[in-house]
């Protein structure tokens, strides 16, 4: 099959549009959508902008870092940094840490690591061992988010960029709708408003399907860790992943439609967030909408 935009051989079919793309035009398509998201999510009016990338060493965060570097490498008013969170999962995080550090060295981007054991004096493996009835993701998620906020503040970042692709984002929207969780829906990144004590999170890959992320990484020689978290099988997200995959097979473009829906209700959600107040956890002092943050209340 030939590329829809040139005479080159196609490497990818965008089923939602029916377009066939060669490697060069796939890269251009991905980068154009990333630029669009950056323009929409980052305020450049203030002058110098500092963006820190939360990089796990997997495909999504590695592509996020690489693409932002390509976009801003000649810009004097944007500085990039990166950090990795080590949850303490034996046999899983080591290869990701190595890939993250290697990519940062290759791109000349400063990189740091912060761990659960440093901040919480425990590891994810210990939490699961001591609490076998707990869904691991329900504990890991809040702890990771807290460390993202702490490390991005340490790096004096205006924004923290997350490697969340279109599939991830649409799954999260479905989960929140299914649970009727309006508050969590309102707190979803990208964050357009600054809240005291919180670094705004941006999602450069929000319009990039997972398959395109993988191909972009391969086409650009980006090494990434493809291993799965050993606790992945117990995640509630798996059900919504399967639902979305079925919907995409039957109606290509469903994920883009879910994204459009989320953006459509964003103004109303932003108004509800504006009216909310941000407290400091009475135990650890980190920002929370409650008296005690989720991390402390679960420990």
Task: Please name every model-derived segment.
Residues 2-187, 195-198, 207-220, 293:
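ATP-dependent adenylation/nucleotidyltransferase module used to activate substrates
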